[in-house]
């Protein structure tokens, strides 16, 4: 009856294709337009819009093998044969088409005729009130009554709050008496390993209302799920999912890397199983564009990687190793998931970087945790403070469940409430900081608006408008007018001025009345739907109730619009070239330039930068219309508009659509046609934080100015080098480099001669202390390289020499001491000597027994410092003799 995992998967999908089902590939682990889920955790999860009637399915019968991640039982992974965070779910689904009869009879047909499982070892459960299912199992399938178990709501009725729900039927396999607990009561539902549930058929036939009343659905649905790993274990006759063919290959690779043999040590086996499970989930998550972070699904990934890394250390693997398993995982899954092959190197890099980062802090964190656990044990306490757990999380990158797991191994529990409190406080601080950065710059102004006033923004359609002054604030107080020279905040009933928001800076321009003119310096969103114009009155006065002409600086706005639309093109290009993980982390759009932060784990290559620039410029040259669509949020998401993960949107949103190249939710201002951007040029690419890169770029006339400046610089270089053409510049530079290298070698020779000459003088003036020669070099110089060279030459020439440099540099003294290992054996300790000598100089110093350095500010004590060194060295040699 043996069947490989790949064979089972393919036979299942082919079987349901033969029953009129459309085979769909596995969906991404990242839920699409479903904020209720962090990660896809069931076969039906990506199909929810079809079940809920929000979207029309491509066919009313669908079959899939869906990759899934579940982490609620992460603490149990490795300790049991069944628990895993990553798994594949086989499923067949009906959206108002067939129902119980087909679902049950086809399931039985597949299990008995395709998998050929012995009928006498199969059992089923049904919901206790589901007589329809009983009749089908008993009369249609022919299963004897004793093998059909009626179970209660807790076991055999699927529902989540209100909405679609229904009874379910589960199929079990009897693994035999020898796998049971031996109790007379052993049967379906027993916690032992004898009866294994492997297929759940859910009959969604009711709609539960808020009063708890069940109404029959007009078009009932079918949702089934069979765990691939679980059925593979049955078909391959093994006791654990870690023993099935594709998982065993990964497990064996881990054993090879760590040098551990599976099955010889129960504690090591747990660690091997943890790594085996977590590396599978990790590979698929990174492959789907998730990057490690401290939030959301990125945090789930970080937990898996760091937990696996810690278990690697428990197996004696202290260096990074997880990336070495990636090829084996891809080899195991390349048939159903060929996309992993091209993503292999990328997955390895992300894994290596994350594990390396954790390795930098894990030892310090483990020491802190172990010391705290020892203290608790000594005091006969068993609760680790939330403050310690939070410090491990915040400072050393320990996910909470990792701390909890390590503590539990020692019989210690973690103060979850204390940890949660500190986490909430940190989130609140971050939320307040973000809030201050967003729309409420007015809070720094300390103004209060009592009346119901509102500013209508008309700046999408026009750059100038007639308006009326509603309020004026000066020095945080409401005033009736502002005179020449005053800086004030003006609220209008309508304005074309864009207020700083979403990374785009505010417009600038002028406000004009019959009696005055004000220059608009900044614009912010204020309270109660107002827009605050920070303005300086440059002529006459501006008064409340004045009719006013508001005029935006056209050139600055146009430059900003070019940069903002270019930012969208850049974002889309990054995701196309680097991968879907390269999502926006922050941005700044201003007239002079644009700045874009995005998720990525390594610097961009020169080739990637050129490719990104070319892609953006190609779209610019195509002069594609830029559509601005106002719609509700749900409609925008259904259109496929990109929404920033952490951004909060109102119900009515603006979609910026650029052909089929880019579509994002955005409230900023944009050009009407990509051709208006002119040109796009990346001027820098750098790191902002771990896993976040930054691109700065320019557009339009700024690119032309950039090119002119570069031409001028190039011309100056050509003239300086006396090159006849630009192409000769590199050759001239190569010649200069060769000449400099030759001169540096010549200089090094002269420096060595000078050092050797000085060394001879110093050696002759040195003190003989026992068998050792103490050479004291007192001089004034800034050439520290020269001093180090002299020191090295002393040690090269004479193993019995001890050298002490006392160097005067401006108003400070530098101490550098070195000796041979032979001198160390005789009692010399440069570290201790330099420490004492530096105290004489009013400073600090130290180092190794054979090399140390330090300094101080009391340069007048250099002679005393030399005398102190002689005393210490004499004492050490004489004491060691």
Curated annotation (Swiss-Prot):
Annotated binding of Zn(2+), by residue: 564, 568, 666, 670
One GO cellular component term: cytosol
Molecular function via GO: alanine-tRNA ligase activity; aminoacyl-tRNA deacylase activity; ATP binding; catalytic activity, acting on a protein; transferase activity; tRNA binding; zinc ion binding
Swiss-Prot/TrEMBL GO biological process terms: alanyl-tRNA aminoacylation
Pfam families: DHHA1 (PF02272), tRNA-synt_2c (PF01411), tRNA_SAD (PF07973)
Keyword hit for ATP-binding: yes
Enzyme Commission (EC) number: 6.1.1.7
Keywords: Aminoacyl-tRNA synthetase, ATP-binding, Cytoplasm, Ligase, Metal-binding, Nucleotide-binding, Protein biosynthesis, RNA-binding, tRNA-binding, Zinc
Cofactor needs: Zn(2+)
SUPFAM superfamilies, per the entry: Class II aaRS and biotin synthetases (SSF55681), Putative anticodon-binding domain of alanyl-tRNA synthetase (AlaRS) (SSF101353), ThrRS/AlaRS common domain (SSF55186), Translation proteins (SSF50447)
Main location as per UniProt: cytoplasm
Domain topic, free-text comment: Consists of three domains; the N-terminal catalytic domain, the editing domain and the C-terminal C-Ala domain. The editing domain removes incorrectly charged amino acids, while the C-Ala domain, along with tRNA(Ala), serves as a bridge to cooperatively bring together the editing and aminoacylation centers thus stimulating deacylation of misacylated tRNAs.
Similarity-based family: Belongs to the class-II aminoacyl-tRNA synthetase family.
Family annotation (HAMAP family): Ala_tRNA_synth_B
Protein name: Alanine--tRNA ligase
Gene behind this protein: alaS
């Amino acid at each position: 009856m043996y069947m490989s995992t790949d064979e089972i998967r393919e036979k299942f999908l082919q079987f349901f294709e033969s029953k009129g089902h459309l085979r769909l590939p596995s969906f991404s682990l990242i839920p699409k337009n479903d904020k209720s889920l962090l990660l896809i955790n069931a076969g039906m999860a990506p199909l929810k819009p079809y079940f809920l009637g929000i979207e029309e399915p491509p066919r009313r019968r669908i079959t899939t093998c869906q990759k899934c991640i579940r982490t609620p039982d992460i603490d149990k992974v490795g300790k049991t044969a069944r628990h895993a965070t990553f798994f594949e779910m086989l499923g067949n689904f009906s959206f108002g088409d067939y129902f119980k009869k087909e679902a049950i009879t086809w399931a039985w047909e597949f299990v008995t005729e395709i998998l050929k499982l012995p009928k006498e070892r199969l059992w089923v459960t049904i919901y206790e009130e589901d007589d329809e299912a009983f009749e089908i199992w008993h009369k249609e399938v022919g299963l004897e009554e004793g093998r059909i178990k009626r179970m209660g709501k807790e076991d055999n009725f699927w529902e989540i709050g209100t909405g679609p729900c229904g009874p379910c039927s589960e199929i079990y396999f009897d693994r035999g008496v020898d796998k049971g607990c031996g109790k007379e009561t052993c049967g379906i539902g027993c916690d032992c390993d004898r009866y294994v549930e492997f297929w759940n058929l859910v009959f969604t036939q009711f709609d539960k209302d808020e009063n708890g009343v069940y109404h029959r659905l007009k078009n009932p649905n079918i949702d089934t799920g069979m765990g691939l790993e679980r059925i593979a274990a049955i078909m391959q006759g093994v006791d654990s999912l870690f023993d099935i063919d594709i998982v065993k290959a990964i497990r064996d690779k881990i054993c090879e890397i760590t040098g551990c043999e599976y099955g010889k040590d129960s504690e090591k086996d747990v660690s091997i199983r943890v790594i085996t499970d977590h590396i599978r989930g990790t590979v698929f998550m990174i492959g789907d564009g998730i990057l490690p972070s401290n939030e959301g699904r990125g945090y789930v990934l970080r937990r898996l990687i760091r937990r696996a890394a810690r278990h690697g250390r428990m197996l004696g693997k202290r260096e990074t190793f997880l990336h070495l398993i990636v090829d084996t995982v891809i080899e195991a899954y390349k048939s159903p998931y060929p996309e992993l092959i091209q993503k292999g190197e990328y997955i390895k890099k992300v894994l290596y970087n994350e594990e390396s980062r954790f390795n930098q802090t894990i030892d310090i964190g483990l020491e802190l945790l172990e010391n705290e656990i020892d203290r608790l044990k000594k005091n006969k306490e068993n609760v680790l403070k939330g403050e310690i757990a939070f410090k491990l999380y915040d400072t050393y990158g320990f996910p909470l469940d990792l701390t909890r797991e390590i503590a539990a191994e020692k019989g210690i529990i973690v103060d979850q409430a204390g940890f949660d409190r500190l986490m909430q406080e940190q989130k609140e601080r971050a939320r307040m900081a973000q809030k201050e950065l967003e729309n409420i710059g007015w809070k720094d102004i300390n103004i209060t608006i009592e009346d119901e006033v509102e500013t209508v923004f008309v700046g999408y359609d026009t750059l100038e408008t007639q308006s009326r002054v509603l309020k004026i604030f000066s020095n945080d107080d409401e005033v009736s007018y502002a005179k020449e020279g005053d800086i004030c905040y003006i609220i209008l009933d309508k304005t074309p001025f864009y207020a700083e928001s979403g990374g785009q800076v505010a417009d600038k321009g002028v406000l004009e009345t019959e009696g005055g003119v004000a220059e608009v310096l900044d614009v912010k969103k204020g309270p109660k739907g107002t827009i605050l114009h920070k303005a300086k009155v440059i002529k006459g006065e501006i008064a409340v109730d004045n009719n006013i002409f508001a005029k935006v600086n056209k050139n600055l706005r146009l430059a900003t619009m070019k940069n903002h639309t270019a930012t969208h093109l850049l974002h889309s290009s990054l995701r196309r070239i680097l991968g879907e993980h390269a999502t926006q982390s922050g941005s700044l759009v201003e007239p002079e330039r644009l700045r874009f932060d995005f998720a990525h784990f390594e610097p961009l290559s020169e080739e990637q930068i050129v490719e990104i620039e070319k892609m953006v410029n190609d779209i610019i040259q195509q002069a594609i219309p830029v559509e601005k669509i106002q719609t509700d949020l749900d409609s925008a998401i259904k259109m496929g508009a990109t929404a920033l993960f952490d951004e909060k949107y109102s119900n009515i949103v603006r979609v910026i659509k650029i052909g089929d190249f880019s579509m994002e939710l955005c409230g900023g201002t944009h050009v009407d046609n990509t051709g208006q951007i002119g040109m796009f040029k990346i001027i820098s690419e750098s790191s902002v934080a771990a896993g976040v890169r930054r691109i700065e770029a320019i557009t339009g006339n700024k690119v032309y100015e950039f090119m002119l400046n570069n031409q001028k610089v190039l011309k100056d270089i050509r003239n300086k080098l006396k090159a006849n053409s630009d192409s000769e510049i590199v050759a001239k530079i190569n010649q200069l480099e060769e000449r400099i290298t030759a001169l540096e070698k010549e200089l090094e020779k002269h420096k060595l001669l000078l050092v050797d000459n000085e060394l001879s003088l110093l050696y002759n003036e040195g003190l003989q202390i026992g068998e050792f020669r103490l050479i004291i070099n007192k001089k004034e110089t800034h050439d520290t390289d020269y001093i180090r060279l002299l020191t090295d030459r002393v040690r090269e020439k004479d193993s019995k020499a001890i050298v002490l440099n006392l160097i005067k540099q401006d108003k400070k003294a530098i101490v550098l001491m070195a000796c041979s290992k032979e001198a160390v054996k005789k009692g010399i300790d440069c570290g201790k000597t330099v420490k004492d000598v530096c105290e004489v100089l009013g400073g600090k110093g130290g180092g190794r027994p054979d090399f140390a350095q330090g300094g101080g500010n009391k340069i007048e004590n250099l002679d005393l410092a030399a005398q102190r060194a002689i005393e210490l060295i004499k004492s050490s040699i004489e004491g060691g003799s």
